[in-house]
């Protein structure tokens, strides 16, 4: 049904950027591409109602948003098949990041139950700019100015150090990890979980309960996978100023790191990496 799956053609799934590429001790400015990350709000029109009810906000890469909405509604048990949907269209929102799904008259939905079940984070607006501003308002930690630099050889040592701490990953190959290091690359603590966001929450929670220094402004956070907006958000709340990861960051993760004064390093493998924001904290 073309009415149901009309493409959102003005959205792009990748975005051009420039990175400082560090190979060995050589630093160069290179063009690159990153995956776009933006919020998508899913709204429902049920029965005779003329007011759409927001039920979920999810961070996603634009593209096939209508399919994402249908899949979400089906896997959450809100619809049983495609025929339950009358239409899907882009909501009247200037960001273009909201979809309204109109259900057919025979479909009954307990909207009050949905509101309780789906937690929509207050820091997640329906445009990237709103999300960034919300995090800036939440992060009221006073951060000291940093004078330090991380030597490239310290940076290159971090992936192996993290891997050595991941006992569960070594056995299963299916778990995310993160670790905190001091500026000399000495291991402090790590956490693991099947969810990368949970792993970081565990690590920060341990710091809150056992370490005297929050914010963690003089530490390095090392991640085992990709860097999403939410991971940078959590790190920013803890005052972390340096994030390194084996994987790539999303576009919104880069934007947030830039705004919050966080050095963001991705594709850290062997003796090479990409520095996406605030490269002054890396000493080649």
Give the label of every model feature segment.
Residues 1-7:
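Short, Lys/Arg-enriched N-terminal segments with co-localized hydrophobic residues
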Residues 8-178, 182-183, 187-190:
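Intrinsically disordered, low-complexity regions enriched in acidic/Ser/Thr/Pro/Gln residues
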Residues 115, 196-284:
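Feature captures the catalytic cores and cofactor-binding loops of soluble hydro-lyases/lyases
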Residues 192-194:
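Short beta->alpha transition motifs characteristic of CBS
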């Amino acid at each position: 049904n073309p009415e149901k799956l009309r493409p959102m053609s003005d959205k792009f799934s990748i975005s051009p950027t420039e990175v400082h590429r560090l190979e060995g001790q050589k630093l160069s400015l290179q063009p690159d591409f990153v995956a776009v990350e933006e919020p998508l709000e899913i709204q429902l029109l049920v029965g005779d109602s003329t007011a759409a009810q927001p039920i979920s906000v999810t961070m996603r890469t634009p593209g096939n948003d209508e399919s994402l909405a249908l899949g979400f509604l089906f896997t959450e048990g809100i619809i049983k098949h495609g025929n339950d949907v009358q239409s899907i269209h882009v909501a009247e929102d200037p960001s273009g990041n909201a979809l309204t799904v109109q259900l057919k008259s025979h479909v009954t939905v307990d909207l009050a139950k949905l509101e309780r079940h789906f937690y929509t984070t207050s820091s997640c607006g329906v445009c990237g700019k709103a999300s960034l501003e919300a995090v800036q308002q939440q992060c009221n930690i006073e951060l000291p100015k940093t004078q330090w630099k991380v030597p490239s050889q310290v940076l290159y040592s971090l992936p192996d150090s993290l891997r050595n701490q991941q006992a569960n990953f070594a056995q299963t190959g299916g778990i995310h990890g993160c670790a905190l290091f001091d500026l000399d690359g000495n291991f402090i603590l790590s956490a693991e979980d099947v969810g990368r966001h949970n792993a970081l929450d565990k690590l920060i929670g341990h710091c809150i309960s056992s370490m005297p220094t929050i914010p963690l402004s003089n530490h390095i956070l090392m991640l085992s996978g990709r860097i999403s907006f939410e991971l940078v958000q959590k790190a920013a709340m803890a005052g972390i100023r340096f994030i390194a990861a084996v994987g790539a960051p999303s576009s919104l993760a880069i934007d947030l790191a830039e705004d919050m004064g966080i050095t963001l390093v991705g594709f850290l493998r062997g003796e090479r990496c990409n520095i996406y924001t605030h490269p002054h904290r890396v000493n080649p």
